[in-house]
């Protein structure tokens, strides 16, 4: 064992490998070698240089988004009467940024006041007062329990609560959606971006978009791909969803603005591409999107509110992109990497030549030569022994 370790250490410290060129005339190996080189060449030029633009340096963007909506809807509900809904009523938040909700449906509980009333059955069914612990609130409770068990209707008793009364009953969602006119609402998106590395600024209001064009255009992916005014119904359909079913229970839609800019060309060719995605599946564990808000007012000296459970479409505007421009450093790096990849052809052909072909032992004999230090002067009388010509006394050690 010690002898073997000594031999290994001796070989590691006192042996040296140097490449040896051998010209092999073999059609199979020659064809495979050139085919591999061709594949590498196509990869380097086609994929790395042309598609991935390996000759460019890149910059990420910083972005700002603002939106405006337009449209009106009318409802006629008991307790509220006829009502016109404009953008100040159905958009949350009202100032409009990259994430907002358009209300399309709702359940209203009008004229609520602070007082005592029976809890909703979801908040706690009871048989007598012993089932209602005073001061306690269940997970779905709408108030604080008083400790009394009172009739909710003719068949069910629930715990009495102190809270906003009457309690909300939200088990019947209006169908069709109350604000179905939302399908025809329009959305105007303003997007400003900057590529700080190249000091380039752009807006989605590009050169082709002017005041006259904006007054009459609506976005269409083929006819008007640069128009920044969108029909909500079109956006939802392009996301792969049905507007009417989405409007009833709500949902989430993503709008992606993609900037892929080649700054080796004029900056006017840097234009946005819009894409639309449905972010919630219909078979989700918790489908739809909803939240609550209240309108507070004072009537006859009493604080009152209208409670709304809102179902709406949550729009998220996501901006992504990258700009590239020629740079000598990544160009030389890519060229060097490509040249290095050509070595794969040599490795694979050596593997084929020395380990797979029937004459592999013969090729190994021609490929590798073992030379040992024989001391000063030894072997100098035989110039053939130091020759690198194939076929002339190459097996010095074994002959």
From Swiss-Prot:
Segments of skewed composition (Polar residues): 385-399
Induction of synthesis: By irradiation and dexamethasone (in thymocytes).
Residues annotated to bind CTP: 68, 70, 140, 186, 290, 292, 309
UniProt-annotated stretches for the region Disordered: 374-399
Sites carrying sugar chains: 153, 184, 210, 300
Any one GO biological process: regulation of presynaptic cytosolic calcium ion concentration
Recorded GO CC terms: external side of plasma membrane; glutamatergic synapse; membrane raft; plasma membrane; postsynaptic membrane; presynaptic active zone membrane; protein-containing complex
Membrane topology field: Multi-pass membrane protein
Disulfide bonds: 117-165, 126-149, 132-159, 217-227, 261-270
Localization (cell): Cell membrane
Extracellular side: 51-338
Chain positions found as Phosphothreonine: 389
The reaction(s) this protein catalyses: Ca(2+)(in) = Ca(2+)(out); K(+)(in) = K(+)(out); Na(+)(in) = Na(+)(out)
Domain description: The N-terminal 20 to 23 and 27 to 29 residues seem to play a role in the cholesterol-dependent gating of this receptor.
Function noted in UniProt: ATP-gated nonselective transmembrane cation channel permeable to potassium, sodium and with relatively high calcium permeability. Furthermore, CTP functions as a weak affinity agonist for P2RX1. Plays a role a role in urogenital, immune and cardiovascular function. Specifically, plays an important role in neurogenic contraction of smooth muscle of the vas deferens, and therefore is essential for normal male reproductive function. In addition, contributes to smooth muscle contractions of the urinary bladder.
NCBIfam families the UniProt entry points to: P2X (TIGR00863)
Assembly mode: Functional P2XRs are organized as homomeric and heteromeric trimers. Homotrimer. Forms heterodimer with P2RX2. Forms heterodimer with P2RX4. Forms heterodimer with P2RX5.
Protein name: P2X purinoceptor 1
Species the sequence originates in: Rattus norvegicus
Taxonomic classification: Eukaryota, Metazoa, Chordata, Craniata, Vertebrata
């Amino acid at each position: 064992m010690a002898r073997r370790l000594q031999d290994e250490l001796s070989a590691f410290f006192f042996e040296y490998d140097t490449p040896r060129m051998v010209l092999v005339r073999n059609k199979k190996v020659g064809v495979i070698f050139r085919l591999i080189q061709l594949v590498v060449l196509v990869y380097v030029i086609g994929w790395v240089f042309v598609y991935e633009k390996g000759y460019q340096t890149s910059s990420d963007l910083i972005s700002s988004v603002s939106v405006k909506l337009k449209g009106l809807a009318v409802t006629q509900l008991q307790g509220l009467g006829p009502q016109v809904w404009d953008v100040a009523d159905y958009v949350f938040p009202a100032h409009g940024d990259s994430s907002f909700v358009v209300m399309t449906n709702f359940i209203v509980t009008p004229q609520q006041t602070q007082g005592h009333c029976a809890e909703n059955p979801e908040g706690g069914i009871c048989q007598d007062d012993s089932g209602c612990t005073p001061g306690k609130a269940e997970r779905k409770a709408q108030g604080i329990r008083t400790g009394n068990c009172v009739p909710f209707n003719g068949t069910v008793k629930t715990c009495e609560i102190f809270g906003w009364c009457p309690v909300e009953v939200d088990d019947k969602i209006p169908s069709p959606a109350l604000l179905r006119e939302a399908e025809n609402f329009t959305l105007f998106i303003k997007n400003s971006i900057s590529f700080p590395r190249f000091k380039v600024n752009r807006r989605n209001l590009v050169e082709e978009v002017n005041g006259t064009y904006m007054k009459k255009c609506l976005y269409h992916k083929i006819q008007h791909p640069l128009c920044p005014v969108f029909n909500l119904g079109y956006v939802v359909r392009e996301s792969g969803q049905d507007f009417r079913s989405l409007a009833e229970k709500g949902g989430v839609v993503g709008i992606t603005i993609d900037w892929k800019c080649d700054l080796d060309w004029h900056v006017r060719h840097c234009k946005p591409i819009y894409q639309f995605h449905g972010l919630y599946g219909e078979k989700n564990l918790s489908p739809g999107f909803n939240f609550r808000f209240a309108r507070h007012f004072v009537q006859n000296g009493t604080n009152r509110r209208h409670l709304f459970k809102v179902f709406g479409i949550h729009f998220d505007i996501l901006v992504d992109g990258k700009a590239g421009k020629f740079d000598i450093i990544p160009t030389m790096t890519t060229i060097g990497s490509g040249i290095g990849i050509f070595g794969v052809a040599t490795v694979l052909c050596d593997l084929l030549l020395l380990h797979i072909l029937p004459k592999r032992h013969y090729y190994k004999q021609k490929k590798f030569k073992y030379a040992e230090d024989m001391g000063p002067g030894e072997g100098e009388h035989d110039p053939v022994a130091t020759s690198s010509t194939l076929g002339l006394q190459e097996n010095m050690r074994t002959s």
